[in-house]
Amino acid sequence: MMKNKTIYILGTPYTIYFDSPEEKMPDGAGGCMDQSLHVIRIAQFEADKNTIQDMESYKKKVLRHEIIHAFLYESGLWNNSGNVQAWAQSEEITDWIAIQSPKLFQVFKEADCL
């Protein structure tokens, strides 16, 4: 079971809440990042015959996804991403990944989501 914790995204503390109840989550979301509160929430998941069985692995994937959102916000790219045409060819996102990846990996390690 993953425990709530605080991590630092480019110097800003973000609190991660695991097993957040449905009423605290956007409809249908497995995770969410609230940049106004510096909070990342991961939903309560229960395995059943129609879902992924390894919920811990899935929670880690969702957490990595939300951490990336937080990095993009804290990097100033949150509102500058209106053009999605050929995004994989963008030098901007390629440079961003190259520059931020060591920091991302460190936070992933601290959040225990690798």
Question: Model features per residue range: what roles?
Answer:
Residues 1-54, 74-114:
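Metalloprotease/metallohydrolase-associated module, dominated by Zn2+-dependent proteases
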Residues 56, 60, 64, 90:
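Hydrophobic (often cysteine-bearing) scaffold residues that line and stabilize catalytic clefts
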Residues 61-73:
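Active-site recognition of the HExxH zinc-binding catalytic motif
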